[in-house]
Amino acid sequence: MIHLIIISAIALAIGIGYRTKINIGLLAIAFSYLIATTLMGLSPKELLHFWPTSLFFTIFSVSLFYNVATTNGTLDVLAQHILYRTRTHPNALYMILYLIATLLSALGAGFFTTMAICCPLAITLCQKADKHPLIGAQAVNWGASGGANLITSGSGIVFQGLFKQMGWEEQAFSLGNHIFIVSIIYPLIVLLLLSCYIRYSKGRTNSSLTIDQPPVLSKVQRQTTLLMISSMVLVWLFPLLHLIFPNIAWITTYRQTFDIGFVSILMVCLALRLKLGKQEAILAKVPWAIIIMLCGMSLLMSLAVKSGLVTLIGHLITTTIPHFWLPLFFCVIAGVMSLFSSTLSVVAPTLFPIIATISAQSPHIDIRLLTTATIIGALSTN
């Protein structure tokens, strides 16, 4: 009975949120409270123990840091410089737009900021170069989605937090990189094939794009760029060294010390001390709606785990679906779910616990393949 109620609560949260535009996370928190206190015998204090504190802090702190680069125009000017330097290659415009969006998103801008910066540029440039604006916008969409999956960017941070919740802390770095690599390669292949088809069916464009020379990076923007690069080096250096030298103790220690959330807070404090942005503007751009949506669904899914629902679903999947077809199954399910809900706040928090259960029951199943298939399926229809 409790399992059916939790499934209904998940479906209702998504359905009501989709129809009424009420934040799905708020609905999930409300359902979690009602289910936990009336059906599972948990007190409100015990329910709060299921709140994904680590995930909440990481998303908040990293978005806070990269809001510095957004508010002072660093990311926008960087995008303009890259476009200006590639203006003599109009036939590669779709690829250039894709790579720029991927780079900006991977640098920490995340999906929505990258779309806001690059989509207007993409449409304008496609019209000037006699290219299809819809394909240009889709190239930006793919690039923003793939780049955000880097472990130091928006979506990648969420996945890292979810992996640690699943008990995959030692594998989180590898799992995140696997998702990132696949999610930028497969759209790249599609765009290459599309570009080749257009080139040979419509011919080459020999003229250069007319793009105004962008402004020089100001002192504030140069300092912001340096802080972004420094934070990525701190977060990436020791995990990479640990992969190469896994038995050196001091590398292992520092790998655990440089947490991206706390590094981001240090960088925010330094940025504010250097007056690289206004604190009020930086705080105002924190994506509270996404944070609430993600944490609320994670709370509801934690109750599903505690009730045994996730274990039951995992057992049903492993006993009814051949292991060979599991990646395709998760890819399709994630794609269908993503048509009506968010990849970060619904699809990943719902399916990752099921993958964890399947992995526990059948250790030989490759969780990298299942998690990557899930995200690729979701991104294909987002």
Residue map of PLM features:
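Hydrophobic transmembrane alpha-helices of multi-pass small-molecule transporters
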Residues: 1-58, 66, 181-312
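Short amphipathic alpha-helical coupling elements at transmembrane boundaries
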Residues: 49, 77-87, 123-128, 268, ...
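Alpha-helical transmembrane segments
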Residues: 54-61, 143, 175-190, 255-257, ...
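Hydrophobic alpha-helical transmembrane segments of multi-pass integral membrane proteins
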Residues: 58, 88-123, 134-137, 320-367, ...
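Membrane-core helix-loop-helix motifs of multi-pass transport proteins
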Residues: 123-218, 366
